[in-house]
Structure formats: structure tokens, C-alpha cells
Amino acid sequence: MANVVVVGAQWGDEGKGKIVDWLAEQADVVVRFQGGHNAGHTLVIDGVTYKLSLLPSGVVRGGTLSVIGNGVVVDPWHLVDEIARIGTQGVSITPETLRIADNATLILPLHRELDHFRETANATLKIGTTKRGIGPAYEDKVGRRAIRVVDLADEALLGAKIERLLAHHNALRRGLGIEEVDGAALKAELLAIAPKILPYADTVWVLLDEARRGGQRILFEGAQGALLDVDHGTYPYVTSSNIVAAQAATGSGLGPSAIGYVLGIVKAYTTRVGEGPFPTELTDAIGEKIGERGREFGVVTGRKRRCGWFDAALVRQTVRTSGIDGIALTKLDILDGFETIKICTGYRLDGRLIDHLPASQADQARVEPVYETIDGWFETTAGARSWAELPAQAIKYVRRIEELIGATVALLSTSPERDDTILVHNPFED
């Protein structure tokens, strides 16, 4: 029996929600280990759609413990709102079903304000953030001045920590011409929200270690995609945390040996939200068609996603940097009806053929995709639950992807419904 880490293998929005829900039904514990409420995921269960952004997917499954790990930055006000919103759909979240790492960093109003100011102040330098304060909160964490969940329980220490935090932020705000933050007001806001957060606080690394030693199945749920990883992504057009599978250990407090099977979620084509390089982007009618069919709009922001052909070179990179054992291929049905389909196998840079995306921002902007064209299929793949139901050309497309990325398909998703899934290998049985 293996614990399972789920990571997006592209730029996010790969369809992790459905796959995580499918796995969560078999898990005892589901853990979020990085990011914040900047990346949404959609679950469709018994015809009911749940949209989550901070809460782990396990919250909609009875009998599953959900955990927000220390690698996550937590907006306490958003968390309270999300718990209430999910509650209106009949999902009861209590301290018995949700635990939050007491050493997790908090996102504060000043982080959201700074994020918004930076992103709108200079259009030529914008990264394409969600303006939700994620980056500035991580900056404070690394700068050792962050307010953490545990600090909400100590009013005296909280005041001292706010004073230290504002020594930095108010100096910065003066330089930017932004009104300074009043420490007393911020403290009052935090003390008001504290009773709604502290009941969920726990020493999560101990809880998870006990679960592991007790033989419980742990599912580590990644947010976004590995190509947005702060080290291994298309820097600087990335998020502010590590997303690759190794972060599951760091962001939860468990050792690397606790990570078992790494499942990469891969869309049958490529999408990206916001700024940054996108070698296979389609700005023509084909790109529009893929976007319309796939309903490619962000769960959190509603922003339209950029669409393009499948980039095997990029996914191959992620397979290596995350140690992916197998993939879940999603949205194959969106490609139904295309006469021909292209797959990017590598790039041309200044006349040279290369098999990976270079780290240089300038080089990333100049690479030209090298395509392989295969015949499409006109039969539907939507709702297929076995290989026998798939058109021969669709199977050929899947097999070619496996060859190019160096990883096999463990699951194949053919619609948003959880049961429309072809199981090749159950990651928990590795």
C-alpha cells in the first residue's frame, strides 16, 4: 500500500479535482501541502458541483480527515467563508474533519493590497497573479516576519509580531505611496477571526506521522501545476511556492520516505492562465474551439485560459522533476472530431533542436515548437469507461503521449463525471 501524491504536470487546471476526488474515496487522510486559495478545483459528485480553492477535496467525503499543511498560506477570512459556502451545500466541516497546521502562515489584508498594487502599477511587468496575497505572504514567511496560525492564540505575542511585520510593510508602503497599516486595527481583525480558526489548529506533522505509522492511506493534494513551480517553472511567471512532488513532504511535515506513488495530472492538450511563455499556444480558430469545448475559464478568477496543442517536452520535464510514476490523462473527449492533432516533441532555438524548455526567460520566449502530426478521430470518447470503447486513433494518441513523456497512463478521464474513468493502475495499490 502506498501513499499517493497528486501533482499537476502542466500549468494547472489539468482536472485534478475529479481525480483527487476519485482517490479521496479510498484515502483516510487528504492533505493540501502548498499554495493558497489562488487555485480552484471543481468536483462533481452525484450531479452536485462543488468549487473549492483552499479546502482539501476530502471535505466532501464522509469519514475522511482533511488537513491543511504548513506549506499552505491561509487566508483566515476566506477559509471561514469557504467553510460556510460549502455548508450551504450540505457539507458539514468541523474540527473532527478538518485540521490546520498551527505553523501555517496567514495571508493578511495587507498582503492582498500589496499584491493588487504591484500587479496593476506596471502593466509591462505584471506576472498574472490572482491578486489574493499569496506571493507577499510567502515573502513574509521567508523573511521570518509572518503571522502564523499559532500566533492567534497569544494576544501579547501577536502584538509584538504585528509590530515587527509592520516595520517592514509600512516602510515599503511609504515608498510606494500607499497608506500605512494601523497595527491596532490589524490586531483587532485577527483577534476577531481567531475563535473561528483556532479550533481547527493542530500539530499536523505529529497527526500525519501517527496516521502513516498506523497504516492509514494518505493522499497529498497539490494545487496549480509543476510548470508554475517557483524553481522549476517558467520563472518569473510562476507562483511563489514549490509545487513539484517533493514539496508534499516539506509542506506537510513528513519525511520524504512517506511519499509513495506520484501521480501527474495531464490534460490531453495544454492551457495556461495569465502571462508567460506558451510555445504551443493557438491563437486561431482551433484554439478558440478547444477553449469553448473545454470550458476553459478559471474557477477562482473566471479568466479565460490560453489553449494550445499538447506539449510533450514540457510534460516530460515535469515527469523528471517530480519523479512521476504514472499519469492521469484528462479531457481526451475535447479532441473528438479533429481531423488532425499535433503534439510538440521538442523545440528549435536559434536553429538548434532541444528537448526541454530552457531556464532563460529570453530563450523561453524565442523557442519554436517542433510538431508531430497524427490523425484524429471522429467517434466520441466522452463517457468511455474501458479501452474497448475508445476509437483506435484515440488509443494511438494516448500511447504516443506515453512514449514521448516517459510515463504510462494510470487513469484516463473521459468526462467531468467521476465514474467516466478508465482505470489502468490504482496508485494506492502500488
Swiss-Prot record:
Pfam families xref list: Adenylsucc_synt (PF00709)
Reaction equations catalysed: IMP + L-aspartate + GTP = N(6)-(1,2-dicarboxyethyl)-AMP + GDP + phosphate + 2 H(+)
Key word Secreted present: no
Superkingdom assignment: Bacteria
GO BP field: 'de novo' AMP biosynthetic process; IMP metabolic process
SMART domains: Adenylsucc_synt (SM00788)
Main location: cytoplasm
Binding site for substrate: 299-305
Binding site for IMP: 13-16, 38-41, 130, 144, 224, 239, 303
HAMAP family for the chain: Adenylosucc_synth
Family in the record: Belongs to the adenylosuccinate synthetase family.
Name by which UniProt lists this protein: Adenylosuccinate synthetase
Species, as recorded: Methylobacterium sp. (strain 4-46)
